A protein has these predicted regions:
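ASCE RecA-like P-loop NTPase motor cores
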Residues: 1-198
Length: 198
């Protein structure tokens, strides 16, 4: 980021003003004031707006709290897995409802790769019990020495989830947070619902 920000100062005029090369930074996720990792500390000069029809579509996005009392983050190690299983069981009807809408794929966000495995196992059992044909896939670390299959996808290959047969992706928050585009053949998000299991 520093190289990109300071590249215009490679050459300066007689007054010390940048003379190029010129740089345009385009990102929808580089304004995170206070973050040394993500923030580009330069003033925003322009904002690109989506087409009116896309803005209208996005305005229809619904956010809601499940009302479940289970909290995974902050729970003791001995309770965390039980809380995660309970939250997954309670979310099954909501997940099935989203799956049956056939609006797109579903993302479940968890706190770790271990939790992704736990949720996948719990959810697969619950889906079969409910006679739901949805299939799950969980993200695995790139460093894992095992091939990805239909029920796993490596972090570095997660963009291919859009083309996989699986309907539900389970991924850790820190692994999916930035730089991953899960899009259909038209460049639109392949995801229709996101559940935060945290």
């Amino acid at each position: 980021r520093s190289l990109m920000k300071d590249l215009p100062y490679l050459r300066t005029d007689q007054h010390g003003n940048p003379a190029g090369p010129h740089v345009i930074l385009l990102s929808g996720s580089s304004w995170a004031e206070g973050s040394y990792e993500y923030h580009v500390n330069r003033p925003v000069n322009y904002i690109l707006e989506a087409d009116a029809e896309k803005r209208v579509f996005l305005e229809k996005t619904r956010f809601f709290e499940s009302g479940f009392l289970e909290r995974i983050s902050g729970a003791g190690d001995d309770q965390r897995v039980a809380q995660l299983r309970a939250a997954t069981q309670k979310a099954v009807d909501l997940i099935i409802s989203e799956y049956e809408r056939k609006a797109g794929k579903i993302l479940l966000v968890v706190n770790s790769y271990a939790q992704a495995l736990e949720v996948q196992q719990t959810l697969e059992t619950a889906l079969r019990k409910a006679n739901c044909s949805a299939h799950t896939c969980r993200m695995i670390a790139d460093a894992i020495n095992a091939p990805s299959g239909e029920d796993t996808v490596r972090r570095g290959e997660v963009s291919r989830f859009a083309q996989m047969n699986a309907d539900i992706l389970i991924a850790p928050a820190m692994a999916i947070e930035r730089g991953h585009n899960i899009v259909d053949e038209y460049g639109h998000s392949a995801l229709s619902a996101v559940f935060f299991m945290v």
